[in-house]
Amino acid sequence: IEHWSDSHAAELHSRLDAARSNSEGLISAKDVTWLPPLTRPGKICGVAMNNSASNDRKIKAPDHPAFFLKPNSCLIGHGADLTVRSYYGSVHPEPELAVVIGGRIRDAEPEEVMSQVFGYTIFNDVTGNGMRAQDMFQYYALYPKKDNPDEVERVEQHLSYAARYKGTDCFGVLGPWITTADAIASPDELAVQCFIGEEKIADDNTSFYNYKVAEVLSFLSYFQTLSAGDVVSMGTAFKPGATRKSIHHANFLKVGGPVSIEIEGLGRQENPVIIEERELGRWRLS
């Protein structure tokens, strides 16, 4: 990715044209085992609460993008079993546009970042609401007093750390492929749909994101260096479908699957949902 250029794109198109002309060598997409197009990205950055449809639910929120990280061990590809263990509690899909970084981005203004975007793909940011609730803390944070930094004050806060409810195995479906940036006129105007079986549970558009792709990448670059192969997932598109049911009704333990996501210009991702009935194993020392 880091060394991708227009000449590489031309060579790839030439090879694809040659492959299409040789029908005997063609393999049906149904016969292919799809891995994530990036199996070991350096980091997967997710943007929290970036859909304007969620703004009326915010009691207090920052005026800039907020991020969390997912480990690459959570990744599976299109068509792979999305395995959910019963002890996870409620788990639902989150259809998102993913940006694949093509070069180093650090301290970059929004007008500068898009030249370092390699392409785009579909990301199902699978989320465990049950584990989010289990990992909730209500506590007093300690801060230096504004009028006397030698003393501290206690401020009541609520927080939940995202490692389990965002980073569990199978909680990141990436693919099926990467569409190069030159093929997408505007990543900020793409239709997004999500289905459970044949039922549409999300019918949205990336135009409803609070922050555009360039803004997200720029803001993030002032804190974390983005490198070739990194993935930035832009946030959930969750405007309900025609049935008015939403992704928040789609607890895999209740509705099963398959789950599929379509994004305009990027294709369709679909995965069977496998429920493992089991209890959490012993983890405390005797």
Task: Label the predicted regions.
Residues 1-66, 88, 258, 262, ...:
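N-terminal non-catalytic cap/leader segment that marks the start of a structured domain
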Residues 1-30, 135-136, 144-158, 227-239:
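A short, charged
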Residues 36-37, 43, 89-91, 218, ...:
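Residue "hotspots" at secondary-structure boundaries inside conserved domains
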Residues 41-208, 212-216, 278-286:
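Glycine-enriched loop-and-adjacent helix/strand subsegments that border the catalytic/binding cleft
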Residues 95, 176, 238-286:
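Charged, cofactor-coupling segments
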Residues 196-198, 235, 264:
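Short strand-turn-strand beta-turns centered on an Asx-Gly dipeptide
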Residues 212-254:
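A conserved acidic, glycine/proline-rich C-terminal tail/linker
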